[in-house]
Amino acid sequence: MRLEELSRLLVGARVNGDPAAEVKGVAVDSRSVRPGDLFICIPGVRQDGHDYADHAKRQGAAALVVERPLDTGLPEIVVKDARHAMAAIACHVYGYPSHEMKVIGVTGTNGKSTVTHLLDHIFAEQGAVTGLMGTLGIKFGGRQYPTLNTTVDALEMQRWLRLMRDAGTEYCFMEVSSHALAMGRVKGVNFRTAVFTNLTQDHLDFHGTMEAYKAAKGLLFSRLGNTFSATPDGRKYAVLNADDEVSREFANCTAAHTVTYGFSREADVRADRIRYSPQGTRFRIESFAGEAEFHIPLVGKFNVYNALAATAAALCEGLALSDIAGRLATAKGAEGRFQTVSAGQPFLVIVDYAHTPDSLENVLSTISEFAEGRIYCVFGCGGDRDRTKRPVMGRIAARYSDCVILTSDNPRTEDPRAILEEVERGIREEGMPSSDYYIIEDRGLAIEKAVDLASPGDVVLIAGKGHETYQEINGVRIPFDDRVVAEQAIRRRMQ
């Protein structure tokens, strides 16, 4: 590839140096540069790729993409936004793989993982070759690959989409985070349908305000045009939660056809006659495609919303409502989402990823509907993240639980004790007496304490980390899995 060829992809770009210079590949990490690569200098929050241009040159880089000219002696493409340039170049290098697949994106504060997993199950059971990208990693071709972020960067995004397509993938179900939208990670991805779950407080450490957070989520819908791979009826769809007022704004900013879901009578896909149990949920769905009875092996109102979102998206793809109901009857939730841990104990232990005020309240309110005995809640809040939600989550835990055990989540670079004090403030504000809550910084000991306290009929909720297999302390990821630790604690008690 020549620099002049790549520069034509980028609005307002100019080439300093030889426009005929050839590059063989693309890199954004100087450590991974190979001879002949184009190194894209990405300015970040903690590090600036421009500072690593000389290292990239020593590694053999043939040219650079920069936001400001550098004195390296290498030819450069100078652009206004290196992240957007990376996305455009990545699409070109990997041959626009999303145009060869049916990509359905899911965004929202809570429910992204479950909705994408439900969609993956529905379509795989229908005989389609499917792939998943999200918090739990990337899955296709019968294999799972770990990732650091919910949505990988633009270069990795296009590389994985190309690998998926070359493996025969027909449908890709993708979690799309607000960070990814704000930072251009999904720029150039040709979404066929975009799904919105809900918007509640989270990530204010990054976005600053709820308005900015909402605006980032809205980018998925404002960019959803009517070109390239549309659904069988020739349209692209925005699938929106009718019970979340933000959906009205998203509907007004998209060129796509909108389909709504929820409990509201105005929803295009609506659930009623809902019956909850610890084993699952029964309900009826009425829709523009008819009505059907559903029984899903997932618990709680929030999972009815997740099933509605997946159903609405599947209907947009032309699937029959009765087929969707049949597929969801055998669906499993995403790992670490309301996942039970059983080792013969006479009480229920649930591990859930709930790490926002809304998700914690959803899980605890669901448990309160069927719990026969006391509810024990083990949780903490992550470090280097939105501090304002800490006392809010403390109040929620105290409101719905009989006993709260505060512990570390991923403290990252913060003092774990300082985080716990901020959460404890909310517990006290809710009026929970000190005799009803414990502060145990060591997460393993906190889980063991809850298991030891539980009696027959009680429920222990271990919230915040879900599927994660590590605990991040002082920048180091230490192996830790709530599910494994809980099972070990149960087995010790049952001996």
Residue ranges with predicted function:
Residues A62, R192, D402:
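Receiver (REC) domain switch/active-site residues of two-component response regulators
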Residues M86-L240, R248-T254, F370-A371, M494:
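Phosphate-binding loop of NTP-binding sites
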